């Protein structure tokens, strides 16, 4: 075994004068490789859904007779939640942040034909093959005509 794999870096102890100077200045050390490898704490699911706690709810103030009341605001909020739940059940969850969510398209069954002009791959291969045969017979006829037009080889043979 080579000893190269067993090499590791050991950070030397910081001198006393540097540690005193950093303490006086208020220096904080930046992120290291070890701090970047640490797992971040997971965010609560409540924070993603908005402010659900009562103390975080918006305050409703009615100044005029036609203003929105607290009860009406709660009804609207319930309608929005129901609409989000129904859209998630439909398979199209939309983000409230406005972020675009990418998802794999649903696979189509071979039985379901979307367009009447679409044919199977076997038919397409057969038609391409017949087209090639037709064009190849035409191209050989053109090559015969063109060979008589250019007769450089014939002149060399005559000499």
Curated annotation (Swiss-Prot):
Q: Where is this region: Disordered?
A: 23-68, 80-159
Taxonomic lineage is: Eukaryota, Metazoa, Chordata, Craniata, Vertebrata
Q: Where is the composition biased (Polar residues)?
A: 135-150
Q: Where is the composition biased (Acidic residues)?
A: 45-57
Alphabetical list of InterPro entries matching this protein? DUF4604, KIAA1143-like
Protein name, as recorded: Uncharacterized protein KIAA1143 homolog
Organism listed in the record: Gallus gallus (Chicken)
């Amino acid at each position: 075994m080579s000893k190269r794999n067993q090499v590791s870096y050991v950070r030397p102890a910081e001198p006393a004068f540097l540690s005193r100077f950093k303490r006086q200045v208020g220096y904080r050390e930046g992120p290291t490789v070890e701090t970047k490898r640490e797992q971040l704490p997971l965010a609560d699911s409540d924070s993603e859904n908005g402010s659900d706690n009562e103390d975080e709810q918006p305050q409703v103030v009615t100044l005029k007779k036609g203003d929105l009341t607290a009860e009406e605001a709660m009804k609207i909020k319930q309608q929005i939640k129901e609409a989000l739940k129904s859209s998630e059940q439909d398979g199209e969850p939309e983000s409230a942040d406005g972020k675009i969510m990418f998802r794999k398209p649903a696979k189509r069954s071979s039985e379901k034909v979307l367009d009447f002009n679409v044919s199977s791959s076997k038919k397409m291969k057969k038609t391409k093959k017949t087209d090639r045969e037709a064009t190849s017979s035409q191209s050989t006829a053109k090559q015969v005509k063109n060979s008589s037009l250019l007769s450089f080889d014939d002149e060399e043979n005559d000499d």
